[in-house]
């Protein structure tokens, strides 16, 4: 394994960030919140939903009979990667949900506003926002091209901020509204900064949005939470990590989808401003068989970034 990656076995507990604002294993505690039955009739807006974790979250909600806005920056097939927003919508419809494909670059403020308006016009409201779209480049300060720095900040931090901001007026009208950012707990161990400080700051920016917006909109009853994988997930992102991560040491996106599904069913007024790990959420809800999420059952798993 490369520095910053470790082979791990499973552990338990439901993760919550406590008042110090620093992630540490001593601060983890188990907590259960009341859950609603399912997401039937709810409307979700999912960014980066043409493949990977975004697609998996969309399909899990669709099985409940949810409405899902499938957004991604292109509606054309990628030459090397599977999936388009239109194919995801077809899968949503087949799973029992209702889908709407929207080509959206979240760096474009006007396009974000237009996309949200289109979603409201089509489905009549909005209940849940999944800020999944993200850019990654694990390079040090001297090696990272500045245009890639700009891309990570424009997509990860600013894009999630703008997306949330555009949706808040509609979420204020919803019953049990949630915003879920796919971002890590705020671990200030310097090891997570030294090799890719720009990416770390960009992802932590998403997490800081969770902290700030959870407090800002607490009285409105809008939940802002974060979800992060305990182990690396087999998505297109691992292809840029060369040999640092092998697919057989990963889990599938479905573990994140099931964990997100559990979080989104919780009472928004009671469950906000928290940082969850996928495996821990599912353990807290009774899941014991995690081999079904493994790309290769029985193989050692690679711990994800930002987790000691």
What are these regions (language model features)?
Residues 28-123, 136-137:
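Short-chain dehydrogenase/reductase
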Residues 42, 97-98, 125-126, 171-185, ...:
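Active-site loop of short-chain dehydrogenase/reductase
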Residues 64, 211-222, 267-269:
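Active-site-adjacent segment of SDR/Rossmann-fold oxidoreductases
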Residues 140-141, 145-150:
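Substrate-binding pocket helix/loop in short-chain dehydrogenase/reductase
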Residues 164-165, 211:
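A short, exposed helix-loop element centered on a Lys and neighboring polar residues
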Residues 172-173, 177-219, 230-232:
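Catalytic loop of short-chain dehydrogenase/reductase
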Residues 226-227, 243-308:
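C-terminal helical subdomain
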């Amino acid at each position: 394994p490369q520095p910053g990656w470790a082979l791990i076995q499973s552990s338990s507990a439901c993760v919550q960030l406590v008042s110090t604002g620093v992630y540490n294993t001593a601060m983890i505690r188990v907590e259960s919140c009341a859950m609603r039955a399912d997401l039937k009739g709810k409307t979700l807006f999912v960014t980066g939903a043409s493949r990977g974790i975004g697609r998996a979250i969309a399909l899990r909600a669709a099985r409940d009979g949810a409405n899902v806005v499938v957004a991604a920056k292109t509606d054309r097939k990628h030459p090397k990667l599977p999936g388009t927003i239109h194919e995801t919508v077809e899968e949503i419809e087949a799973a029992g949900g209702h889908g709407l494909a929207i080509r959206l670059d979240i760096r474009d403020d006007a396009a974000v506003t237009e996309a949200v308006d289109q979603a409201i016009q089509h489905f009549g409201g909005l209940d849940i926002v999944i800020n999944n779209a993200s850019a990654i480049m694990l390079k040090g300060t001297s090696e990272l091209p500045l245009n890639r720095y700009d891309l990570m900040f424009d997509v990860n931090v600013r894009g999630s901020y703008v997306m949330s901001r555009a949706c808040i007026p509609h979420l204020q009208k919803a019953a049990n509204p949630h915003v879920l950012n796919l971002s890590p707990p705020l671990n200030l161990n310097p090891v997570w900064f030294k090799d890719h400080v720009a990416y770390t700051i960009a992802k932590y920016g998403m997490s800081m949005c969770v902290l700030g917006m959870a407090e800002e909109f607490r009285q409105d009853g809008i939940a802002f939470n974060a979800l992060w994988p305990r182990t690396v997930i087999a998505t297109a992102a691992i292809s840029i990590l060369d040999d640092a991560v092998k697919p057989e040491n990963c889990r599938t996106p479905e573990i994140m989808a099931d964990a997100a599904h559990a979080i989104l069913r919780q009472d928004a007024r009671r469950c906000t401003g928290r940082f969850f790990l996928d495996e821990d959420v599912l353990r807290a809800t009774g899941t014991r068989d995690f081999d079904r999420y493994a790309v290769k059952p029985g193989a050692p798993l690679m711990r994800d970034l930002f987790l000691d």
